[in-house]
Amino acid sequence: MFLLYEYDLFWAFLIISSLIPILAFFISGVLAPISKGPEKLSTYESGIEPMGDAWLQFRIRYYMFALVFVVFDVETVFLYPWAMSFDVLGVSVFIEAFIFVLILIGGLVYAWRKGALEWS
């Protein structure tokens, strides 16, 4: 039998943790002074008067490097618990981690061959 009352603590935590940021944004929006002027509309650059246009276009290469970094950063997050529990879980976990690493290496080779890692 599936008992829903066992999840009451979870739902209470979910509701409270959702309401706190919503209330914080609402209260700051109500209590914050609203003053619009040329100083508020200008770009802030370390207290120095801005020179030129504040809009700057980034090259797509930065995005590709960031994406590859995030993929391998997440890989590290997944591999660390596997490495710490290897002696308890055994060979099956090693095989799963090996397959996971092979898939990521395949993705890295694909990105390399497509030229995503070339800096030109």
From Swiss-Prot:
NDH is composed of at least 16 different subunits, 5 of which are encoded in the nucleus. NDH shuttles electrons from NAD(P)H:plastoquinone, via FMN and iron-sulfur (Fe-S) centers, to quinones in the photosynthetic chain and possibly in a chloroplast respiratory chain. The immediate electron acceptor for the enzyme in this species is believed to be plastoquinone. Couples the redox reaction to proton translocation, and thus conserves the redox energy in a proton gradient. Its main location: plastid. One of its GO terms (cellular component) is chloroplast thylakoid membrane. Keywords: Chloroplast, Membrane, NAD, NADP, Plastid, Plastoquinone, Quinone, Thylakoid, Translocase, Transmembrane, Transmembrane helix, Transport. This is NAD(P)H-quinone oxidoreductase subunit 3, chloroplastic. The gene is ndhC. It catalyses: a plastoquinone + NADH + (n+1) H(+)(in) = a plastoquinol + NAD(+) + n H(+)(out); a plastoquinone + NADPH + (n+1) H(+)(in) = a plastoquinol + NADP(+) + n H(+)(out). It holds the Pfam family Oxidored_q4. It is a multi-pass membrane protein.
